[in-house]
A protein has these predicted regions:
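N-terminal phosphate-binding loop and adjacent alpha-helix
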Residues: 1, 29, 43
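N-terminal glycine/serine-rich phosphate-binding loop of ATP-dependent small-molecule kinases
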Residues: 1-25, 53, 81, 137, ...
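Glycine-rich beta-strand-to-loop/alpha-helix junction loops that act as flexible
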Residues: 7-11, 141, 190-193
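Residue-level structural signal for beta-strand termini and adjacent loop
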Residues: 28-29, 106
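Carbohydrate-associated surface elements
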Residues: 32
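Active-site core segments that coordinate phosphate-bearing ligands/cofactors
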Residues: 36, 43-58, 66-101, 111-122, ...
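A conserved helix-loop-beta module that forms one wall/lid of the active-site cleft
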Residues: 128-140
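Glycine-rich phosphate-binding loops at beta-strand->alpha-helix junctions
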Residues: 140-148, 168
Length: 263
């Protein structure tokens, strides 16, 4: 019998709901690059030092706060309708429970969370023109958000007592799955994006580098470096440069011993 459900999913995407909890517009996802202007404004006008003070991070085009500013500037009619701001996986949790929720690891990537103190940053909310009431309730990844709504339980064939936990952003969830928890553990992940993920029991931030300082799903923190294109680069190298799709053959040809870090 299923006792609990949780979610792990892509981070940073903007899902906005109206007063009836209906989605106002299609979600703007993490890899959408339309927010260059808004990102430059945050980094250059507000300043990286201030952003780091408020959120422990600097602005990137994929983060959620620049997306909110983009909607505010380009779709004022939609911005005016916003009653709740959510992330993609958390919207699914809302559909199951009726609770507007977000875990700390995923919230860290919004550029709206005071990561050190684990609360919404009043300064960033003001900069984006939104209120605390428009933000979801915050949870640790392992905390219970609620239980299934009766109609959802019936549709899924699950008991109404089935709990729903907050879950985590995709990289934090994957890190837990690989044992990258506690202090000083590292994982390299190559998917649609590429990340280097280092778990830490201590909080540290440097506004002069491009590392993300996020809350981790284990209740501590992590540092993460990210690039938007990773595994697809391997595909490009194979198909466009080597002119082959025989990945197994190329893998077998890789030398086990190399020289000067070339294999």
């Amino acid at each position: 019998e299923v006792a609990g459900i949780s979610f792990g999913g892509q981070m940073h995407g903007l899902v906005i709901l109206d007063e009836k909890d209906q989605v106002i517009r299609p979600a703007i996802l993490w890899n959408d690059g339309r927010t260059t202007k808004e990102t430059d404004y945050l980094n250059q006008v507000i300043g990286k030092e201030k952003l780091s003070e408020y959120t422990a991070n600097i602005a990137f085009a994929g983060f959620t706060a620049p997306k909110i500013l983009w909607v505010k500037e380009n779709e004022p009619e939609n911005f005016a309708k916003i009653c709740k701001i959510m992330l993609p996986k958390d919207y699914l949790a809302y559909c199951l429970t009726g609770v507007h929720c977000c875990d700390y690891s995923d919230a860290s990537g919004m550029l709206l969370l005071d990561v050190k103190n684990k609360c919404w940053s009043e300064q960033m909310l003001e900069i984006c023109g939104v209120s605390r009431e428009q933000m979801p309730e915050l949870f640790e990844s392992y905390e219970k958000v609620g239980t299934l709504k009766p109609e959802v339980a019936k549709e899924l064939g699950l008991p109404e007592t089935c709990l729903v936990a907050a879950g985590a952003g995709d990289n934090a969830a994957a890190a837990v799955g690989t044992g990258t928890v506690g202090d000083g553990q590292c994982i390299v992940s190559l998917g649609t994006s590429g990340t280097i993920f280092i778990s830490s029991e201590n909080f540290g931030v440097d506004p002069h580098n491009a590392l993300h300082a996020f809350a981790h799903a284990d209740g501590h923190y992590h540092l993460m470096g990210c690039m938007l294109s990773a595994a697809s680069c391997n595909k490009w190298w194979m198909e466009d440069i080597l002119q082959t799709q025989d990945f197994a053959k190329e893998q077998a040809a890789i030398q086990s011993q190399g020289r000067n870090h070339v294999f």
